[in-house]
């Protein structure tokens, strides 16, 4: 059995913090808990984001009701989370509508929120997708209308666009920032070379470079965030905002006995995830997760909490985006912050030994 202390009084983190602390609340017990500082700079920018953010992929406007979305967002905000991420493509724009309605209804100060959206797949027309100047400007305008906001804090290019010159994309991103439609811009699913090219173009033409890459990062996907992005961070200041810390639920342990009903892998359009889980590699991963479960029990936490804390222990990660379909999941995930101080070097080494997939940079080979 897991201990009931998942959402109890949190420990203070040894993170480099200077901003206002968030307040951890336990809705289960009703009383505000000790203040906890858990904000980090997004890359080398001055933007302070909570080390955990709430994503809206699959859930908002799709898997969950609008009422549940409001409940989850309120829980997140009350627990100090200030980062909320969406995209024009999520639920064909409905995720942005739901998010915008909640912000308007709750009356939260806009200046207390960090809202991010992603542009690439807008509509079915040829001109409604990609990273052309036309779609970046029109797509972001449409997103802002759905969100009922004057600006987003970060607009992301949701994937690279080989059909558009890099200079055009960087100029368009600079334009929307100069027009007050966004504060910063970033990339998602871009390679290190593509990010470096965008930075070089920005420097060459006195434009605004990206500050962050959104990348998939979890125990079974490590190379990009642990080897490639740290080099970019040190060279040009691009940070990492990571998503899918539980590998679409694989790391949660929920699939160790097959595909449960109402899980993401059971949804229409997620046959790829089901196939992945039931594959030979998927079975090997489940065996490793059983070993990791023993470490989680030793630390007094759940497997999802261990997995999220493991992502947070990476100093190059500015924020980890969470996905949740109910309040229990969200509060459990937020409880990962309490596990972070317990991840000693020996525990991390033990986890690496079980996973057997630690990537090595050129520096590691030289030393």
Swiss-Prot record:
The modification Phosphoserine is found at residues 9, 14, 20, 31, 112. Detected in brain. Detected in the middle third of the molecular layer of the dentate gyrus in hippocampus. Detected in neurons in the deep cerebellar nucleus. Detected in globus pallidus and pars reticulata of the substantia nigra. Detected in cerebellum. Detected at axon terminal plexuses of cerebellar granule cells. Detected in the juxtaparanodal region of nodes of Ranvier in cerebellum (at protein level). Detected in mesenteric arteries. NADP(+) binds at residues 56-57, 63, 85, 158, 188-189, 214, 243-248, 254, 262, 264, 323, 325, 329, 332-333. Signal peptide: none annotated. The active site is at 90 (proton donor/acceptor). Homotetramer. Interaction with tetrameric potassium channel alpha subunits gives rise to a heterooctamer. Identified in potassium channel complexes containing KCNA1, KCNA2, KCNA4, KCNA5, KCNA6, KCNAB1, KCNAB2 and KCND3. Interacts (in unphosphorylated form) with MAPRE1. Forms a ternary complex with SQSTM1 and PRKCZ. This is Voltage-gated potassium channel subunit beta-2.
């Amino acid at each position: 059995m897991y201990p009931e202390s998942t959402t109890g009084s949190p420990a203070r983190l040894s993170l480099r913090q200077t901003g206002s602390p968030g307040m951890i609340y336990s809705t289960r017990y009703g009383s505000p808990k000790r203040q906890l500082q858990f904000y980090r700079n997004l890359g080398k920018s001055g933007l302070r984001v909570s080390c955990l953010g709430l994503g809206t992929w699959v859930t908002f406007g799709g898997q969950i009701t609008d009422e549940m979305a409001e409940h989850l967002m309120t829980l997140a905000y009350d627990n100090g989370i200030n980062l909320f991420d969406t995209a024009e493509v999520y639920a064909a724009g409905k995720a942005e509508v739901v998010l915008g309605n909640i912000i308007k209804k709750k009356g939260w100060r806009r200046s207390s929120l960090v809202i991010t959206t992603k542009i690439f797949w807008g509509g079915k027309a040829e001109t409604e997708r990609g990273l052309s100047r036309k779609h970046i400007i029109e797509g972001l305008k449409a997103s802002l209308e759905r969100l009922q906001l004057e600006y987003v804090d970060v607009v992301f290019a949701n994937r690279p666009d080989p059909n558009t010159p890099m200079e055009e994309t960087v100029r368009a991103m600079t334009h929307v920032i100069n027009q007050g439609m966004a504060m910063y811009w970033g990339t998602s699913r871009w390679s290190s070379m593509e990010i470096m090219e965008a930075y070089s173009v920005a420097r060459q033409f006195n434009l605004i470079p990206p500050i962050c890459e959104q990348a998939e990062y979890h125990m079974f996907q490590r190379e990009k965030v642990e080897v490639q992005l740290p080099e970019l961070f040190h060279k040009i200041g691009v940070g990492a905002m990571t998503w899918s810390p539980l590998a679409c639920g694989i790391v949660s342990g929920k699939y160790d006995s097959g595909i449960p009903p109402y899980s993401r892998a059971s949804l229409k359009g997620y046959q790829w995830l089901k196939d992945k889980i039931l594959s030979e590699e998927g079975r090997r991963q489940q065996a490793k997760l059983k070993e990791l479960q023993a470490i989680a029990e030793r630390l007094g936490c759940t497997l999802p909490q261990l997995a999220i804390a493991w992502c947070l222990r990476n100093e190059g990660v500015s924020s980890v985006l969470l996905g949740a379909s109910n309040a229990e999941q969200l509060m459990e995930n937020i409880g990962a912050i309490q596990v972070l101080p317990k991840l000693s070097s020996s525990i991390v080494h033990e986890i690496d030994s079980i996973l057997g997939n630690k990537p090595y940079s050129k520096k590691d080979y030289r030393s």
